[in-house]
């Protein structure tokens, strides 16, 4: 019996070590990106993203906690606009600040998560005219510390976050094309 327990312990230790070593092979940075063509001009779409107060109309994260606390600060929109949120476990808590606003082509946002996991990333929106439409790209990128790499062994971040971006872009499309 003792020999069987020892064998199981060794197998578990090797398995855990294997997962940890595999996590170390993951990239040191990540990037998730989705794009969608919206049949609206960039100057009509841009304000819906540059003003955080409009995010309640299209962001997939806003509906996950109707009681979420929101604090808007800085400028009303564009560079310097800030947004802090504190909600349930589905949305966590964090802070965003628009660092770069190139009307109507690009927004770069500093994105700091406090809960459920601490993280410091960058979100970026680009708006590229294409005939009578605008290609909107929503991206998030940043460092991948060891805990993120370990999570990536079990969870595909691109799939998980990418689905949210797809839902958000589809909602933004409905709003912009009204």
Give each language-model segment a name.
Residues 6-72:
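Hydrophobic ligand-binding cavity/cleft-lining segments
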Residues 29, 80, 104-106, 131-135:
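A generic structural signal for beta-strand entry/edge sites
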Residues 31-33, 91-96, 118-124:
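Short, surface-exposed coil-to-beta transition loops
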Residues 35-39, 84-86, 97, 108-110, ...:
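Generic structural detector for well-ordered beta-strands
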Residues 49-59, 87, 165, 169, ...:
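Sec/Tat-exported extracytoplasmic proteins
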Residues 53-95, 104:
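Short beta-edge strand/loop motif at the mouth of beta-sheet-based domains
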């Amino acid at each position: 019996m003792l020999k069987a327990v020892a064998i199981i312990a060794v197998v578990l230790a090797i398995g855990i070590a294997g997962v940890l070593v595999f996590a170390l092979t993951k990239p040191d940075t990540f990037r998730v990106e989705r794009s969608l063509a919206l049949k609206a001009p960039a100057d009509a779409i841009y304000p819906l993203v540059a003003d955080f107060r409009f995010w309640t109309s299209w962001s997939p994260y806003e509906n996950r906690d109707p009681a979420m606390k929101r604090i808007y600060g800085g400028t009303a929109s564009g560079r310097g606009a800030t947004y802090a949120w504190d909600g349930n476990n589905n949305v966590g808590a964090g802070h965003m600040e628009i660092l770069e606003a190139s009307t109507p082509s690009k927004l770069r946002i500093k994105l700091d998560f406090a809960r459920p996991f601490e993280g410091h990333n960058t979100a970026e929106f680009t708006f590229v005219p294409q005939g009578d439409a605008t290609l909107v790209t929503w991206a998030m990128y940043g460092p991948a510390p060891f805990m993120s790499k370990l999570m990536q062994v079990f969870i595909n971040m691109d799939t998980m976050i990418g689905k949210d971006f797809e839902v958000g872009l589809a909602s933004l499309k409905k709003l912009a094309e009204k």
